[in-house]
Amino acid sequence: EDQKRRSKRALTDAIDRALIDLLAIYRDVLMIQVGGDGELINTDLADLVGQIARDSTHRQTLARVEHIETARKRLVSNGNPLLVLEDMAISLRPQA
């Protein structure tokens, strides 16, 4: 039982770290969209960040950030990791 709980916690922590990394990417996207003068956190992903910034609006980016934050909250509240990630992934799809 204890091992099962530790395993679930490790999975949740790993997913949360990945979501924090994703938030950092969207922070960079938003910074480009609003013309911020700060440096990119994800310099290795500058091309991808630039493309996302060009292909979306700052409102879409803010909505995506909110969806990622919601996913993090649901994980902490013992949400099913697969369902949480699926819901978030659907919300992050590019808008037509």
Regions found by a protein language model. Give the residues of each.
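AAA+ P-loop NTPase domains with strong preference for DNA replication initiators
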Residues: 1-56, 72, 76, 83-92
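Short glycine/proline-rich, acidic loop/turn segments that cap or connect secondary-structure elements
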Residues: 54-66
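Terminal low-complexity regulatory extensions
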Residues: 64-66, 90-93
